[in-house]
């Protein structure tokens, strides 16, 4: 029999007699208890479901007597019935569209006085409940006065729990009377009773609000304690989102003192005090999870019971997605999620006919007590309706889902919608590019995309999709699977971009599971350097050379980046390297301003060990700088970026391009960063330089930067950022090395031997490893830099001429170069050594197309520095000395600056911007510089702007300067008049520092010069 939903379209409250007479007899169902209030539409949304009442366990020869002709039971049938009949079997399965819970309980015949069991399908109570959920009665009918003196029976919505006896002589629950028997009953028998205020010594009632039980029969006398044998029955009325505690009229209660937060009221029979029952679900061991409107699902609750006197097996059905756990105890049931979409309920008892004791205090589940999955007993299962197919279950291995609990007051449809992720939100969570191993295995081993569902309301292992959502889920799955093609590169998953440049991109990656690769990967993450392969240009050649060098070096040294694989696709080449997650050494120094001597010594020893290992393998890096030195998790050095690296000596097999020189490591390519590169790269007259000595110079610059926090030769006032490369290297060659005060003696000594402009006088690698500064790290050199251990190995360049077939991975159809390299033409040494652009986007040295312009005396701008497009935006000027800690450097090996006479060369270098040919008698005007500070020993210089300009123009007199520093005027004036090419500087000492070339305009005030903050202040020139 199909249930017809109950609709109330009238504004007035209809009589309960009309509601009962027009209602159908419907089977009662027990449903789950949820904290979330369902909307009003939930009363009629679930159209077909199957419910089944199981036979009551009887004693003796009592047999059930079902009625097959009529679903109604008359009063005579009820009187003659002494057992609990089965209302309908599997063939006759009427459905009822509701979420109510019934009150099947034992009762007694009022006329005979003998016990009998409820056996009818009565929907009058359900109709009244549905009616009362839409109509609130604020006044008590006059018929209720004999039972209760309360003025109103509007109580908070709560589950209905009653304890009745099996041995009572009268009916303990409301039953419907037929119209033919209504005349035989007296008026008092037809008086409706409000169970909310039914009080007795032995009866404890927890009822629902807004319930009127008109035309129901109740026992004339209340049984005593001796006649009672309690049994628990749970009723959950419909909870709508429209009802809340704020709408309750608490003033109308006469005996109510407290109302619980969940709206559950427990009425005690011994006193009129009403105590709240805040954990009703917990007392029955029920823990329910909230459902959502988007999960159009049907869960099935099956129940199985052991032989237990007076208990009914429960079968629950609802459109909500449930997660129910019943505590496993002596007197309570146990419900747990099974592997499928069904739930099983098991009632445990010690003996077969043991009586059920009264409910004890509510127990709470601890974290260690997890409900075990129980098996489903036969004969106790049912299907979900004809309109709803079997819910589909998708298992999520190793995917943790957090479950959110909601209280009864705050749970509503609005809150539910806010917590439901949309399809776009799921895609934005980057499930396809997971950051951990568990999600990675789920996405790529199971080959399943995340469906459109609310994972917060599902269990930890399963979530369910109804048939209505199959189409949406399949479309989303196809969309997500299609988008995964853009996230793979060979047998690797591409992640975020961590670096860009002219050559291409550097991306994070993860190896796909089940990939046929014999390469040992120390970490699950890798770094993939991707270069376009559409054109056979110098970038591709450099990439192939880098692959050959890294493959020839092997993964034997801990301070050199590890090579893993080479991938070739239709349009790209890629080098797969080990991921170093500590960042660049540049950022590490910049965050700490400078490093301690012990830390810098340890990092420098690791750097020297790695570079010495490269040299022993015949490899020159040629681009050592702070940006190419990485740090791992333990803050250890890892040398990376071999874009400029090349080979030399007996490792070079290209004999037709070999150099007939005594030194096999001579090169002619001007590469690398200017501030780290050795000066012989530009100033060498022969055009050749030693690659090993150039790497040693770069190591010295890195050590100086770690100790000081800034670079040693980047403070030229006329070339602040080293844009003019020839002038930069001239400045390096002609400027003595000055150290800060906090440098230790051993660090100064090793830097003096490394940072020598002449490569012939520069210290060798073996002498550096034996220096006293690195004496505490000798064990590192003995392990990885032993001369006997560095035996000759096959040349890395020889691999460039070897061609072999590429191994094809079983996971992807893209060729993966795991053990061999395939290159087209043979790369000559000229192409390896003469190409200017770098793969990593470093500074590119190019000849200027503009005419040669003289910058200063003897210096011409014949070569300028141009950064490559899209190069890394990082200036060396970030590493500067702190402005608030500027101190003059101490001049070593000189007791007094005034006693030592500097040479003419030093004087000309200090005043090169003011020198003019002696043949020109025009006055000197400072048009290219702006003096920042002029300091004399133990004197303070204070002068006006006109005095300074007159001094520089040669139109000065002693009156401008007074008697403070007359020697300065005399010497400058004699220099301007060209009295002699060299003059006596015995009494003069001047430290001049400039900021930047700037046209002198307007009136120059010396007080402004004193107030300016100096950008850098390192070099001191003495004359």
From Swiss-Prot:
<keyword id="KW-0418">Kinase</keyword>
<dbReference type="InterPro" id="IPR017441">
    <property type="entry name" value="Protein_kinase_ATP_BS"/>
</dbReference>
<feature type="compositionally biased region" description="Basic and acidic residues">
    <location>
        <begin position="889"/>
        <end position="898"/>
    </location>
</feature>
<dbReference type="Pfam" id="PF00069">
    <property type="entry name" value="Pkinase"/>
</dbReference>
<keyword id="KW-0547">Nucleotide-binding</keyword>
<feature type="compositionally biased region" description="Polar residues">
    <location>
        <begin position="294"/>
        <end position="314"/>
    </location>
</feature>
<dbReference type="GO" id="GO:0005524">
    <property type="term" value="F:ATP binding"/>
</dbReference>
<feature type="binding site">
    <location>
        <position position="529"/>
    </location>
    <ligand>
        <name>ATP</name>
    </ligand>
</feature>
<keyword id="KW-0808">Transferase</keyword>
<dbReference type="InterPro" id="IPR011009">
    <property type="entry name" value="Kinase-like_dom_sf"/>
</dbReference>
<feature type="binding site">
    <location>
        <begin position="498"/>
        <end position="506"/>
    </location>
    <ligand>
        <name>ATP</name>
    </ligand>
</feature>
<dbReference type="InterPro" id="IPR034674">
    <property type="entry name" value="STK_Kin4/ppk1"/>
</dbReference>
<feature type="region of interest" description="Disordered">
    <location>
        <begin position="55"/>
        <end position="119"/>
    </location>
</feature>
<feature type="domain" description="Protein kinase">
    <location>
        <begin position="492"/>
        <end position="774"/>
    </location>
</feature>
<feature type="compositionally biased region" description="Polar residues">
    <location>
        <begin position="60"/>
        <end position="103"/>
    </location>
</feature>
<feature type="modified residue" description="Phosphotyrosine">
    <location>
        <position position="492"/>
    </location>
</feature>
<feature type="compositionally biased region" description="Polar residues">
    <location>
        <begin position="333"/>
        <end position="365"/>
    </location>
</feature>
<feature type="region of interest" description="Disordered">
    <location>
        <begin position="883"/>
        <end position="906"/>
    </location>
</feature>
<dbReference type="GO" id="GO:0005938">
    <property type="term" value="C:cell cortex"/>
</dbReference>
<protein>
    <recommendedName>
        <fullName>Serine/threonine-protein kinase ppk1</fullName>
        <ecNumber>2.7.11.1</ecNumber>
    </recommendedName>
</protein>
<dbReference type="InterPro" id="IPR008271">
    <property type="entry name" value="Ser/Thr_kinase_AS"/>
</dbReference>
<keyword id="KW-0597">Phosphoprotein</keyword>
<dbReference type="GO" id="GO:0106310">
    <property type="term" value="F:protein serine kinase activity"/>
</dbReference>
<dbReference type="GO" id="GO:0004674">
    <property type="term" value="F:protein serine/threonine kinase activity"/>
</dbReference>
<keyword id="KW-0067">ATP-binding</keyword>
<feature type="region of interest" description="Disordered">
    <location>
        <begin position="285"/>
        <end position="314"/>
    </location>
</feature>
<feature type="active site" description="Proton acceptor">
    <location>
        <position position="623"/>
    </location>
</feature>
<comment type="similarity">
    <text>Belongs to the protein kinase superfamily. Ser/Thr protein kinase family.</text>
</comment>
<feature type="compositionally biased region" description="Low complexity">
    <location>
        <begin position="104"/>
        <end position="115"/>
    </location>
</feature>
<feature type="region of interest" description="Disordered">
    <location>
        <begin position="333"/>
        <end position="381"/>
    </location>
</feature>
<dbReference type="InterPro" id="IPR000719">
    <property type="entry name" value="Prot_kinase_dom"/>
</dbReference>
<keyword id="KW-0723">Serine/threonine-protein kinase</keyword>
<feature type="compositionally biased region" description="Polar residues">
    <location>
        <begin position="372"/>
        <end position="381"/>
    </location>
</feature>
């Amino acid at each position: 029999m199909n249930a017809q939903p109950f609709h109330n379209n009238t504004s007035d409250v209809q009589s309960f007699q009309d509601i009962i007479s027009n209602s159908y007899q419907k089977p009662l169902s027990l449903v789950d208890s949820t904290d979330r209030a369902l909307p009003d539409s939930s009363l009629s949304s679930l159209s077909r479901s199957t419910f089944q009442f199981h036979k009551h366990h009887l004693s003796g020869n009592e047999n059930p007597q079902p009625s097959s002709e009529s679903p109604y039971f008359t009063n005579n049938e009820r009187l003659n019935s002494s057992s609990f009949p089965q209302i309908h079997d599997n063939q006759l399965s009427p459905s009822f569209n509701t979420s109510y819970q019934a009150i099947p309980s034992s009762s007694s015949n009022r006329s005979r006085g003998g016990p009998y069991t409820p056996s009818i399908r009565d929907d009058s109570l359900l109709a009244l409940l549905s009616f009362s959920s839409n109509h609130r009665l604020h006044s008590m009918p006059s018929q209720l006065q004999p039972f209760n003196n309360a003025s109103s029976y509007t109580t908070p919505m709560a589950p209905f729990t009653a304890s009745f006896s099996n041995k009572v002589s009268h009916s303990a629950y409301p039953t419907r009377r037929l119209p033919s028997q209504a005349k035989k009953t007296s008026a008092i028998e037809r008086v409706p009773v409000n169970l909310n205020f039914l009080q007795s010594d032995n009866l404890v009632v927890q009822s629902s609000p807004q319930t009127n039980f008109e035309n129901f029969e109740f026992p004339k006398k209340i049984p005593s304690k001796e006649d009672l044998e309690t049994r628990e029955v749970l009723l959950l009325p419909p909870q709508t989102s429209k009802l809340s505690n704020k709408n309750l009229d608490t003033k109308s209660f006469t005996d109510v003192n407290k109302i619980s937060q969940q709206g559950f009221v427990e009425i005690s029979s011994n006193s009129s005090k009403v105590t709240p029952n805040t954990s009703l679900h917990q007392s029955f061991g029920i823990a329910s999870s909230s459902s959502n409107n988007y999960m159009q699902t049907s869960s099935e609750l099956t129940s199985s019971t052991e032989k237990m006197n007076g208990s009914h097996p429960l079968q629950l059905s609802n459109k909500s997605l449930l997660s129910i756990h019943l505590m496993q105890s002596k007197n309570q049931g146990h419900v747990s999620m099974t592997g499928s979409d069904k739930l099983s309920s098991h009632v445990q008892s010690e003996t077969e006919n043991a009586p059920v004791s009264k409910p004890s205090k509510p127990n709470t589940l601890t974290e260690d007590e997890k409900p075990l999955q129980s098996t489903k007993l036969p004969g106790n299962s049912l299907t979900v309706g004809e309109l709803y197919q079997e819910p589909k279950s998708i298992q999520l291995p190793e995917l943790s889902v957090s479950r959110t609990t909601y209280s009864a007051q705050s749970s509503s449809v609005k809150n539910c919608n806010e917590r439901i992720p949309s399809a776009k939100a799921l895609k934005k969570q980057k499930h396809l590019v997971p950051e951990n191993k568990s999600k990675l295995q789920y996405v790529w081993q199971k080959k399943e995309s995340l469906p459109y569902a609310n994972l917060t309301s599902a269990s930890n292992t399963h979530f369910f999709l109804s048939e209505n959502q199959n189409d949406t889920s399949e479309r989303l799955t196809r969309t997500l699977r299609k988008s995964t093609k853009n996230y793979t590169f060979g047998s690797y998953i591409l992640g975020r971009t961590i670096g860009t440049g002219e050559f291409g991109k550097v991306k994070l990656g993860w190896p796909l599971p089940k990939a046929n690769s014999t390469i040992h990967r120390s970490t699950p993450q890798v770094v993939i350097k991707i270069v376009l392969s559409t054109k056979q240009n110098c970038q591709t050649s450099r990439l192939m050379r880098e692959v050959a060098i890294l493959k020839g070096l092997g993964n034997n040294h801990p301070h050199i980046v590890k090579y893993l694989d080479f991938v070739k696709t239709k349009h790209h080449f890629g080098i797969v390297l080990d991921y170093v997650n500590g960042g660049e050494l540049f950022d590490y120094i910049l965050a700490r301003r400078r490093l301690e001597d012990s830390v810098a010594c340890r990092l420098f020893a690791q750097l020297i060990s790695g570079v010495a290992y490269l040299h022993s393998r015949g490899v020159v890096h040629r681009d050592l700088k702070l940006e190419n030195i990485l740090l791992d998790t333990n803050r250890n050095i890892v040398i990376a970026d071999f874009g400029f690296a090349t080979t030399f000596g007996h490792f070079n097999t290209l004999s037709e391009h070999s150099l007939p020189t005594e030194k096999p490591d001579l090169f002619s390519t001007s590469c690398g960063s200017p501030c780290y590169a050795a000066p012989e790269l530009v100033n060498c007259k022969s055009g050749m330089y030693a690659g090993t000595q150039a790497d040693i110079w770069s190591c010295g610059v890195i050590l100086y930067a770690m100790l000081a926090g800034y670079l040693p030769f980047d403070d030229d006032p006329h070339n602040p950022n080293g844009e003019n490369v020839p002038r930069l290297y001239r400045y390096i060659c002609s400027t003595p090395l000055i150290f800060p005060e906090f440098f230790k003696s051993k660090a100064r000594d090793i830097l003096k031997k490394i940072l020598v402009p002449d490569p012939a006088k520069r210290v060798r690698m073996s002498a550096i490893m034996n220096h006293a500064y690195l004496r505490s790290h000798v064990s590192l050199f003995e392990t990885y830099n032993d001369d006997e251990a560095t035996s000759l190995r096959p040349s890395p360049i020889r691999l460039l001429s070897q061609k072999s077939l590429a191994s094809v991975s079983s996971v992807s159809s893209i060729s993966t170069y795991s053990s061999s390299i395939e290159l087209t033409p043979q790369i000559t040494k000229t192409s390896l050594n003469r190409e200017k652009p770098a793969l990593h986007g470093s500074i590119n040295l190019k000849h200027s197309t503009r005419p040669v312009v003289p910058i200063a005396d003897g210096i011409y701008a014949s070569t300028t520095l141009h950064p490559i497009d899209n190069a890394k935006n990082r200036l060396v000027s970030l590493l500067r000395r702190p402005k608030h800690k500027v101190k003059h450097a101490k001049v070593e090996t000189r007791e007094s600056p005034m006693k030592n006479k500097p040479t003419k060369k030093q004087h000309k270098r200090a005043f090169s911007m003011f020198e003019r040919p002696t043949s020109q008698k025009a006055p000197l005007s400072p048009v290219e510089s702006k003096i920042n500070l002029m300091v004399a020993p133990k004197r303070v210089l204070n002068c006006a702007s006109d005095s300074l300009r007159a001094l520089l123009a040669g139109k000065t007199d002693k009156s401008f300067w007074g008697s403070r520093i007359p020697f300065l005027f005399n010497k400058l004036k004699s220099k301007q008049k060209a009295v002699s090419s060299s003059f006596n500087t015995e009494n003069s000492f001047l430290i001049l520092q400039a900021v930047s070339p700037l046209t002198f305009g307007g009136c120059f005030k010396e007080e402004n010069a004193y107030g300016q903050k100096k950008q850098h202040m390192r070099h001191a020139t003495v004359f």
